[in-house]
């Protein structure tokens, strides 16, 4: 059976082309002894296999065989593409691989049915384009194994929302350029959360900018609250 999943602790999680940017960064945090909730990745190759075995890939290729149309037409194509992904059956071996990884995660957590978040983790092949996490709809929350295959397909389908298509079109989008994995990670209730990123400083180097909020970072991602902001030399 093909390997459809990679745990964040496994060496394969170093490969952005397999696990996507977000999962790769989580693996690096683990390597540096930073505490990260347990999880695994449904690999980018799994999406390729799903599209091929379900017939969805041929339907999507037909939809995107011409240049993307104007706004109204784009909305129609987007809806058809999303429906194609969500309406296609996942093969038994792919579903079994994903459920098997979830059950292994449950044993790690000593929990019968761990609550997990299921965002998409994208890499552009072969590193031609920047990565913008906020472009994609994300983070379904699953409470047991029965909804997991649906959540994974929803993550894949987020590649074909109008927002995603506009972004891809703006950077010279091609179907073959996009490789998307799905991160399945134990969902915890944080006391505080946030994001950290680098920004140029006045001397030509980089400082670290940290934006933090109480509770979940979802409020920060959606712009609902004003974060505490710190700049570190």
Question: Language-model segments: which ranges?
Answer:
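Short conserved micro-motifs at the rims of enzyme active sites and ligand-binding pockets
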Residues: 129-130, 195, 219-224
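Short beta-strand elements
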Residues: 120-124, 137, 186, 195-216
């Amino acid at each position: 059976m093909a390997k459809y999943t990679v745990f964040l602790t496994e060496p394969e999680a170093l490969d952005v082309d397999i696990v996507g940017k977000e999962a790769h960064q989580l693996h690096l945090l683990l390597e540096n002894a930073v505490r990260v909730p347990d999880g695994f990745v449904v690999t980018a190759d799994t999406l390729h296999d799903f599209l091929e075995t379900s017939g969805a890939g041929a339907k999507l290729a037909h939809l995107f065989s011409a240049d993307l149309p104007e706004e109204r037409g784009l909305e129609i194509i987007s809806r058809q593409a999303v429906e194609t992904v969500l309406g296609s059956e996942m093969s038994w071996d792919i579903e079994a691989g994903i459920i098997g990884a979830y059950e292994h995660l449950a044993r790690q957590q000593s929990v019968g049915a761990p609550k997990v978040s299921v965002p998409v983790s994208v890499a552009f092949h072969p590193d031609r384009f920047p990565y913008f996490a906020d472009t994609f709809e994300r983070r379904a929350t699953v409470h047991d194994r029965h909804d997991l295959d649906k959540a994974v397909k929803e993550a894949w389908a987020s590649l074909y929302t109008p927002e995603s298509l506009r972004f891809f079109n703006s950077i010279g989008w091609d179907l073959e350029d996009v490789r998307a994995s799905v991160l399945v990670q134990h969902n915890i209730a944080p006391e505080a959360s946030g994001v950290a990123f680098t920004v140029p400083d006045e001397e030509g180097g980089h400082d670290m900018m940290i934006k933090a909020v109480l509770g979940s970072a979802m409020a920060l991602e959606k712009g609902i609250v004003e974060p505490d902001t710190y700049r570190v030399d």
